[in-house]
């Protein structure tokens, strides 16, 4: 009986959040360990279906870097990175589009549909969803110690998002699953960082939440303790004093950009935790790090 009461209390704790987020859009960047662990893939798909059934509108944007790397390796092609961006020639772009828009995207769609969801797979080329431009990058030349433009090939940045196809799918009960591939004005194809795509889509949709699934608990302080909430005003100081470093910097910048475009809150959470998205959305404590404007 105590176990049954505990389960009932969990449902009651979720009720105000279900009411608050009814018909709201939640953009989830799906990547990392949650995409490769069989049990976590299964649970993520079930969680997404649950979100839709109880009245939320989940939009999934997925990565797939390791899967691209595996295919390139099998072809005998070495992967090169500059500041975390894969150098993408035409052959690599063809592989990325095949892996992201084909294998990875359709596997996620199939997993969701297996649990009675109605997922539809898209890339940024579909419905002119993602208009992209070539990413301009600079790096410090080690000889001259001056910044220089670095050509990383067909790596893109988001120029604009066309939300029509997403809202049409949402309004008809479908769950969009989006591969981070964009199209340029001249029809060229670009590989885009999935965090950036998720943030820009969340902003364009004025989503209630942007959730980035990662392979860490969230943002940590210098003692390794999780920081549960970060006001955007604190981020520059946390970067300057070395608290936030490495790959967490672009993730936080992505969150801030999404907030600037109208997203209510952004969250960096541990995708290795079972039901991480549900715990973040429907519990008082949440999980991971919430990023927002919490001070006036």
Curated annotation (Swiss-Prot):
Pfam families according to UniProt: AA_kinase (PF00696)
Site positions per UniProt: Transition state stabilizer: 29, 251
Catalytic activity: N-acetyl-L-glutamate + ATP = N-acetyl-L-glutamyl 5-phosphate + ADP
InterPro entries: AceGlu_kinase-like_sf, AcgluKinase_fam, ArgB, Asp/Glu/Uridylate_kinase, Glu/AcGlu_kinase, NAGK-C
Gene3D superfamilies to which the protein is assigned, alphabetical: Acetylglutamate kinase-like
SUPFAM superfamilies (UniProt xref): Carbamate kinase-like (SSF53633)
Gene Ontology biological process terms, A to Z: arginine biosynthetic process via ornithine; L-arginine biosynthetic process
Coiled coil (residue ranges): none
GO cellular component: cytoplasm
Highest taxon in the source lineage: Bacteria
Role summary: Catalyzes the ATP-dependent phosphorylation of N-acetyl-L-glutamate.
Family designation: Belongs to the acetylglutamate kinase family. ArgB subfamily.
PANTHER family from the UniProt entry: N-ACETYLGLUTAMATE SYNTHASE, N-ACETYLGLUTAMATE SYNTHASE, MITOCHONDRIAL
UniProt-recorded name of the protein: Acetylglutamate kinase
């Amino acid at each position: 009986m105590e176990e049954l009461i505990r389960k009932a209390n969990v449902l009651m704790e979720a009720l105000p959040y279900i009411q608050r987020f009814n018909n709201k859009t939640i953009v989830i960047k799906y990547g990392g360990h949650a995409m490769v662990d069989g049990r976590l893939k299964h649970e993520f798909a079930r969680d997404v279906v649950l979100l839709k059934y109880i009245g939320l509108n989940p939009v999934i944007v997925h990565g797939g870097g390791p899967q691209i790397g595996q295919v390139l390796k099998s072809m005998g092609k070495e992967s090169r990175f500059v500041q975390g961006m894969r150098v993408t020639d035409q052959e690599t772009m063809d592989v990325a589009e095949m892996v992201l828009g084909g294998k990875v995207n359709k596997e996620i769609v199939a997993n969701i549909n297996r649990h009675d969801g109605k997922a539809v797979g898209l890339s940024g080329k579909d419905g002119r969803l993602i208009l992209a431009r070539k990413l301009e990058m600079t790096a410090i030349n080690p000889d001259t110690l001056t910044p220089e433009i670095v050509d990383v090939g067909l790596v893109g940045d988001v120029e604009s998002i066309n939300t029509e196809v997403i809202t049409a799918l949402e309004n008809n009960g479908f769950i969009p699953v989006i591969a981070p591939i964009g199209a340029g004005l001249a029809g060229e194809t670009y590989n885009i960082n999935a965090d950036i795509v998720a943030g820009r889509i969340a902003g364009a949709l004025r989503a209630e939440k942007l959730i980035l699934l990662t392979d860490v608990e969230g943002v940590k302080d210098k003692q390794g303790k999780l920081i549960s909430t970060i006001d955007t005003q604190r981020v520059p100081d946390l970067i300057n004093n070395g608290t936030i470093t490495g790959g967490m910097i672009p993730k936080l910048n992505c969150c801030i950009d999404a907030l600037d475009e109208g997203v209510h809150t952004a969250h960096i959470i541990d995708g290795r935790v079972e039901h991480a998205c549900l715990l973040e959305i429907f519990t008082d404590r949440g999980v991971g790090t919430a990023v927002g404007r919490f001070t006036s």
